[in-house]
Design a protein with these regions (language model features):
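Non-catalytic substrate/cofactor recognition surfaces at enzyme active-site rims
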Residues: 1-154
Length: 154
């Protein structure tokens, strides 16, 4: 704490910005299959819970829900608030978008999307981008990167 560099800030150093986006959902989110799983009283509780959360995401999306991405600026420090569990590439890209400032990222703002991979990660496979872990489509990377760029532009 004692080694922390402290800087005074004024109201002109503070900013709050919001970008709303629709996240492209995974093709594996099939309403009829999820509804059957949820209605199946012989299915295990974990599968039924998973189906219910995925159905809730589908319902929110169908109703026009947009996810809020936000930026808090405190002087030269920027904090992005993001949905889901993001791959580290999003943090690295955010820092490159604003190389002369500190950029921090706080994810898990809304966990409905689950893991959010990069476009290429969905073709490479792995736990984080499989149907049980991620509810987003590969196109999500462009949506989020574009929104991050808009947020970080002064």
């Amino acid at each position: 704490w004692e080694a922390t560099k402290k800087s005074p800030i004024s109201t002109s150093d503070l900013a709050w910005r919001v970008e709303r986006v629709r996240l492209p959902l995974a093709a594996t989110l099939q309403r009829d299959t999820l509804e059957k799983t949820l209605a199946d009283t012989t299915a295990n509780d974990r599968d039924r819970l998973n189906a219910s959360t995925k159905l809730a995401l589908l319902n929110r999306t169908d109703a026009g829900h947009q996810f809020e991405l936000t930026r808090l600026r405190l002087g030269s420090v920027n904090v992005l608030h993001m949905p889901g569990e993001l791959f580290v590439e999003y943090q690295l890209a955010a820092q490159q978008m604003k190389p002369d400032a500190t950029v921090c990222m706080a994810a898990y703002g809304d966990y409905a999307p689950g893991y959010i991979g990069t476009e290429i990660a969905y073709t490479q496979g792995g736990y984080e981008v499989q149907a049980s872990s991620s509810n987003t489509a590969p196109a999500v990377e462009k949506v989020l990167m574009d929104a991050m760029r808009r947020l970080l532009t002064d």
